[in-house]
Design a protein with these regions (language model features):
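Hydrophilic extracytoplasmic domains
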Residues: 223-289
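N-terminal "mature head" segments of proteins
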Residues: 1-89, 259-289
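Acidic, low-complexity intrinsically disordered regions
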Residues: 23, 63, 75, 134, ...
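Short helix-loop boundary/capping segments
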Residues: 108-226
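Acidic surface patches and DE-rich sequence motifs
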Residues: 71-72, 86, 99-102, 177-178, ...
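Short N-terminal edge-element motif at the start of the domain
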Residues: 47-146
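Polar low-complexity intrinsically disordered regions enriched in Ser/Thr and small residues
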Residues: 71, 75, 116, 200-203, ...
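A residue-identity detector for tryptophan
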Residues: 27, 67-70, 79, 138, ...
Length: 289
């Protein structure tokens, strides 16, 4: 996403192409990319917890188990994972690390969360289902040896209690790097809902601070789709130095081809085409995140 200077019109989420009528819809591509990336983060954390807890714990007490500390020959950090049962079917966990060459250094928590397991009809826990929250702290990780380029924090909540249940994922990213502008730190909010066999939605808000060449602004995207794949995105953009709200709406069919697009502030026919009556959702709906 980028914020143009005062001579430009809008804050935009960038995609690789500018869709034309009949081509793959630009805002479908944005919706898919954002949802796959953010949802993938939640799935990756869940998979990591399950992977580690599949191994025998190093130590076990009545309500907690500890894996580690363990070291790898090429990893300068030694890691420890603690899982604590806080209530029936409810667990808290934390991933901690420290410099493996400093055995008296305190452990630093880089990932922590809580999880309530989904239960089947017999009251037994189902792997891969549940509700909870977690925080991934890249700033904390940066205090340990060999940090990566990530900074800031990600706070997730999720709910998928069983097969056939609604999936909800929310995320807040605070002071993370913008891939397009590595020197910028930005905030973003995200919400995803998928009803089983039915409609789904994604909301994404991106806040960009001002700098020497940009006044900054806020972009909001709300996308909705049918189970067939046909959908619609409605976008609003407010740049700090512009007195107007910039809007974009685009619809796509079940083949993800763009069928309708409107950009009220543009007179370019490439930005305005098709009939809104063909949309899976006939009226715009803007994000309220």
């Amino acid at each position: 996403m980028s914020v143009p200077n005062s001579s430009a019109k809008a804050l935009t989420v960038e995609s690789s192409t500018r869709a034309l009528e009949g081509q793959t819809a630009e805002w479908y591509l944005v919706t898919r990319a954002v949802s796959y990336t953010v949802n993938g983060g939640a799935l990756a954390v869940g998979a990591l917890v399950r992977l580690i807890t599949d191994y025998p714990a190093t130590s076990v007490s009545r309500d907690s188990a500890v894996w580690g500390p363990w070291q790898g020959p090429l990893d300068p950090v030694e890691w420890m994972i603690t899982v604590t049962r806080v209530a029936p079917h409810e667990y808290a966990y934390k991933f901690e690390g420290r410099d493996k060459h400093d055995p008296i250094a305190p452990f630093v928590t880089v990932l922590s969360g809580v999880h309530t397991a989904g239960l089947n009809e017999l009251g037994r826990e189902m792997e891969g289902f549940g509700a909870g929250s977690f925080t991934l702290d890249w700033d904390a990780r940066a205090t340990l040896p060999a940090p990566d380029r990530n900074v800031g924090k990600a706070n997730y909540t999720y709910d998928h209690m069983g097969p056939g249940q609604v999936v909800t994922i929310k995320a807040q990213f605070r002071q993370v790097k913008d891939d397009d502008r590595p020197d910028k730190l930005v905030d973003a909010d995200y919400a995803f809902v998928q009803n089983p066999g039915s409609v789904g939605s994604m909301d994404f808000i991106y806040n960009v601070p001002a700098d020497a060449v940009s006044a900054g602004g806020v972009g909001k995207v709300r996308s909705r789709w049918q189970w067939s794949g046909a959908g619609r995105s409605d976008v609003t953009v407010n740049a700090t130095d512009l007195p107007v709200t910039y809007t974009v709406s685009e619809c796509w069919n079940e083949h993800y081809a763009s069928t309708f697009k409107t950009v009220p502030l543009s007179s370019d026919p490439k930005d305005n085409y098709g009939s809104e009556e063909t949309c899976a959702f006939a009226t715009p709906e803007y994000s309220t995140l």
